[in-house]
Regions:
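Intrinsically disordered, low-complexity regulatory segments enriched in Ser/Thr/Pro
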Residues: 62-125, 203-245, 255-256, 283, ...
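Long, solvent-exposed non-transmembrane regions
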Residues: 2-19, 50-52, 65, 72, ...
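Amphipathic, interaction-prone secondary-structure segments
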Residues: 33-87, 346, 388-393, 398-407, ...
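Acidic, proline/glycine-rich low-complexity IDRs
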Residues: 149-196, 202-203, 207-330, 334-341, ...
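Amphipathic alpha-helical segments
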Residues: 15-42
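Charged, structured surface patches that assemble and position nucleic-acid processing machinery
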Residues: 109-153, 157-165, 169, 176
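Long C-terminal interaction/binding lobes of large macromolecular proteins
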Residues: 347, 418, 446, 453, ...
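Alpha-helix boundary/capping motif
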Residues: 336, 376, 399, 411-413, ...
Length: 553
């Protein structure tokens, strides 16, 4: 049986992309798989009694070493903020290429806590900062110092001791440019160094809380139980800064989505499913119910999605247990077709992720195909003609061409860059000033504009001639020729319409990171948790690959 890849016109709608969940393809999971054979060390731990100071953690294999340098800082409660305008954080971090010398640690002590204002060197690969969940951190310290383990209900509700507010890489603020390291096999997957930083920061939070508790009451203090550590991750607060990325990197976006679609296609094409694969799928599905029921949010938008997801998952489990025969040919194709007919988008994509769990042999080769040499596809084939371009637009953007951009509802929003932090923002063009500073993120509108310009022209007119008088649409001409080869490179939705839900764009990217517990705080920012349930560094050599579905076992 040959299953077609899913239609980009359906999959690339924001409501569907905003229903994606982590999977075996997610970057934090592929990072753990890649680095499980590396030697982990805590090389320096120089904190005072209150937990302030410097620590260094490393992964080493043969002659290659990556070192996380941590600077824990004392700040006032009124200085602690997750917003981008913050200037102080509880801790700041950089991932250093190699073994840092004392001079490096001293140099970076003056720069890393400044974050965007500081300056790094080519020796540094990533940069981040994080704030404590003060309520949780203080509770854990108090409990441990008195010889007790902390309240599991509180820890389950929050899920972390610290949350990061930004992770930077690839040449920002003096960090090493990607060309310096891109040929290293171990970091071939997207965002692998960023995942390493977050993973090691997680371990630092456990070590710090143990250290503070021990110094508070040396005679009675106990360490945080490893099982509890495992069930804690790192939180993250993410705003609109992440949204333009998926618009500005079309071939990379395509490769992420395409890997997922190929995995699903191949799984649906399996004629006979082995008993152990069937059982693993069902076990992960049932175990994941705990993840859904422990998903805390105050967002009405997300609560509705969670409620419907839980209802549909239970309906699906009942179908599997009572009505479905896994012995029939192509069982996962039957399952997928049933899901499309009977359940919501959130449930469909949730189960698609779980379908991948038994099939590491299918998924693992795809992990290596998720990066992109984007500059290869930047040049516009100017020898092509207008007729070619029209056909591409009609075939690849059919739904977008139906949008009427002459009405306010379709044109309501505009994207701009804030002056104070150089971060993306979204505004109402009919109520706020600044539309003259609009960023080129309204791809649907510009595609429609391009199409209307092409309509009266002769098909044999060359693209180079067209661009002489139409340079303002050059960016979407390029995108059209990209989507011709990369079908999942474009969001098939209006990113400036009144119905835009920006967190759908954030959630798409975060699902590929491997995030859990999406908790929208508005339609423009949300909190998530990463590495919750993941093995600890000293457990990496032999860990359960399905850890993400067994967080609270």
């Amino acid at each position: 049986m040959n299953i077609e890849l899913r239609d980009p016109n359906i999959i690339m709608k924001l409501s569907r992309l905003g229903s994606f969940h982590q999977s075996r393809l997610s970057f934090l999971r592929s990072f753990l798989s890649e680095f499980k054979d590396w030697q982990y060390n805590r090389d320096l731990f120089d904190l005072d009694q209150e937990g302030y100071g410097t620590a260094v953690y490393s992964f080493k294999k043969k002659d290659r070493v990556y070192s996380l340098i941590c600077y824990a800082n004392k700040i006032n409660d009124d200085e602690r903020s997750d917003r981008v305008i913050a200037t102080k954080w509880d801790a700041a971090f950089t991932l250093h290429d190699g073994v840092p010398l004392k001079e490096d640690i001293d140099r970076l002590r003056n720069e890393v806590p400044k974050q965007e204002v500081g300056r790094l060197s080519y020796k540094e690969l990533t940069l981040s900062r994080a704030n404590k969940s003060v309520r949780v951190f203080d509770h854990v310290v108090e409990s441990l110092s008195n010889g007790n383990q902390p309240d599991l209900e509180l820890l389950e509700k929050v899920g972390y001791l610290y949350r990061t507010t930004a992770v930077y890489g690839s040449g920002k603020f003096g960090l090493a440019d990607r060309f310096r390291i891109k040929n290293r096999e171990e970091i071939n997957g997207p965002f692998r160094l960023e995942m390493m930083l977050v993973y090691l920061v997680r371990q630092f939070t456990f070590d710090q809380v143990n250290h503070v508790a021990k110094n508070k009451n040396p005679n009675s203090a106990v360490k945080l139980d490893p099982k509890i550590c495992r069930n804690l991750g790192i939180g993250n607060s993410t705003g609109l800064g992440m949204a333009p990325f998926i618009v500005n990197h079309p071939t990379l976006l395509n490769n992420w989505i395409l890997s997922r679609e190929i995995a699903l296609k191949k799984i649906r094409e399996i004629k006979i499913v082995k008993t152990q694969d069937r059982d693993l799928f069902k076990d992960c599905l049932k175990s994941s119910l705990k993840n859904i029921t422990s998903w805390n949010t105050e967002s009405e938008y997300q609560l509705k999605k969670i409620k419907l997801l839980l209802k549909d998952i239970k309906k699906f489990i009942s179908f599997l247990e009572n009505k479905f025969d896994f012995q029939k040919d192509y069982p996962f194709n039957e399952i997928y077709l049933w899901l499309e007919k009977e359940t919501c988008e959130e449930c469909i994509e949730y189960v698609v992720s779980i379908m991948m769990e038994p099939f590491g042999d299918i998924v693992q080769p795809l992990v290596g195909q998720m990066s992109s040499e984007e500059e290869k596809y930047f040049n516009i084939p100017t020898e092509r003609n207008v007729g070619d371009l029209k056909k591409i637009l009609e075939n690849k953007y059919s739904d977008i061409l139906k949008i009427n951009f002459n009405i306010e509802e379709s044109n309501q929003k505009f994207w701009f860059i804030s002056k104070n932090k150089e971060e993306p923002r979204l505004a109402n063009r009919f109520e706020e000033n600044g539309a003259d500073l609009e960023q080129p993120l309204a791809i649907a509108r510009d595609i429609k504009k391009l199409y209307e310009r092409l309509l009266p022209l002769k098909d044999d007119l060359k693209i180079n001639q067209f661009l002489i008088d139409n340079s303002d649409v050059r960016h979407v001409v390029r995108r059209a020729f990209i989507i011709e080869k990369f079908p999942y490179s474009e969001i098939q939705d209006n990113t400036i319409g009144e119905n835009l839900v920006p967190i759908d764009m954030l959630r798409l990217k975060l699902s590929f990171f491997g995030a859990l517990k999406f908790d929208p705080r508005s339609d423009k920012w949300l909190r998530i948790c990463m590495f919750q349930g993941a093995p600890l560094p000293n457990e990496l050599k032999d860990y359960d690959e399905q850890w993400v579905y067994k967080t609270y076992s």
